[in-house]
Amino acid sequence: MSYLIKNGFMLDEKGEKVQRDIRVEGDAISEIGSLEAASGETVIDADGLFVSPGLVDLHVHFREPGGEKKETIETGAKAAARGGFTTVAAMPNTRPVPDTKEQMEWLVNRIDETASVRVLPYASITIRQTGREMTDFEGLKDAGAFAFTDDGVGVQTAGMMYEAMKKAASINKAIVAHCEDNSLIYGGSVHDGEFAKANGLNGIPSVCEAVHIARDVLLAEAAGCHYHVCHISTKESVRVVRDAKKAGIRVTAEVTPHHLLLSDSDIPGLDTNYKMNPPLRSPEDREALLEGLRDGTIDFIATDHAPHTEEEKQQTMSLAPFGIVGLETAFPLLYTHFVKTGKWTLKQLHDYMTVKPCEAFGLPYGKLEAGRSADITLIDLEREEKIDKSTFLSKGKNTPFDGISCFGWPAMTMAKGKLVYQEGRLVK
């Protein structure tokens, strides 16, 4: 199938808007320039639309296998397509865990059968994510593992993490870490701050995260491993990562939209749609995250899309599971609150969600160039709509942003040369 995307605008290397047409043949971009339609070619009129590389999210939870009531690979991929994402990386805290070559092969086949966008599967660092016995890294890599993580829990012992890092380095794969010292969680459900005190809740202190990162960057230095910090959330953590980068340690970090947009002072009562892990931190932490993103300490943005059933989220703040969904709201929220207000340029947001995650992990995506995969998102920057969780394609409706008015909604998503979302509906 051949497509010609005409009349839209792209960003050049300086962030200037330039009008360009894009020809797609098969699964790749074949030409970019001022182009005329060829015979039999399908023309997509992108007049007034921002033509972006497909967005990239390297931290999602699709729950399959074992959690299909919350999400499946198919529904998660549909949510990604609606949100403008063409490449996502799925975390391994499923049941069973992808901790064997056979389980990874099953997962890769399931992705091929049901996903409308590119889904990169993480493998677990330890068997069943228990932290006790390391998985077969070589076998999992051969079966298609993107990287290794026990996300959902932190690897508690330094010895296990060090051995995992050495093994990962030997096969040129990254260790991706959920950073949390279990002895410092204290049964918490929110940040250990004013909100916790006012509502009589156990709090999770900032040091719970930062102390794990401090340990791990030293282990990564010793092992020669690429170490990536998931969903960084505290000013202390930002300081540790900044210092590690200055020391030449190969560390990267991501931050979520919700940690950039909200702090614990924004939680309206005991609303479990504001419960996630790591929790919303203090306003000072939020400012440190924004500064870390600006100065390059934090490399890119990832949603940590974490769907749950409505029944689960109707429990108390202490009992409800951690997590919110984010794939269908990330770009509009960030564009509205940071680009429309002049705090960021469109180029900065574009890079945080396309170029930079791909550069961090050496992925050949995130750019619009001839010869690259035809992963393209058309975004209407002027369209204003309210977030309506009832329209989500994800099974999860657990969002704190329901009803918020946003600009910058994806109008069409093309993944690997196939139209997967267009004008408010999926393209079959």
Curated annotation (Swiss-Prot):
Cofactor(s) listed in the protein's UniProt record: Zn(2+)
Binding locations of Zn(2+) 2: D151, H178, H231
Keyword Hydrolase belongs to the record: yes
Alphabetized GO MF terms: allantoinase activity; dihydroorotase activity; zinc ion binding
Catalytic activity entry: (S)-dihydroorotate + H2O = N-carbamoyl-L-aspartate + H(+)
SUPFAM superfamilies in UniProt: Composite domain of metallo-dependent hydrolases, Metallo-dependent hydrolases
Entry annotation: catalytic residues: D304
Protein name: Dihydroorotase
Cellular component terms per the entry's GO annotation: cytoplasm
UniProt xrefs under Gene3D superfamilies: Metal-dependent hydrolases, Urease, subunit C, domain 1
Keyword set, alphabetical order: Hydrolase, Metal-binding, Pyrimidine biosynthesis, Zinc
Listed GO biological process terms: 'de novo' UMP biosynthetic process; purine nucleobase catabolic process
Free-text function comment from the UniProt entry: Catalyzes the reversible cyclization of carbamoyl aspartate to dihydroorotate.
Residues holding Zn(2+) 1: H59, H61, D151, D304
Gene (name only): pyrC
Classification via NCBIfam families: PRK09357.1-2, pyrC_multi
Residues noted as binding substrate in the record, renumbered to the chain: H61, F62, R63, N93, N277, H308, F322, G323
A Pfam family this chain is assigned to: Amidohydro_1
Cofactor: record remark: Binds 2 Zn(2+) ions per subunit.
CDD domains named in the record: DHOase_IIa
Xref: InterPro entries: Amidohydro-rel, DHOase, DHOase/Allantoinase_Hydrolase, Dihydroorotase_CS, Metal-dep_hydrolase_composite, Metal_Hydrolase
Pathway: Pyrimidine metabolism; UMP biosynthesis via de novo pathway; (S)-dihydroorotate from bicarbonate: step 3/3
Family: Belongs to the metallo-dependent hydrolases superfamily. DHOase family. Class I DHOase subfamily.
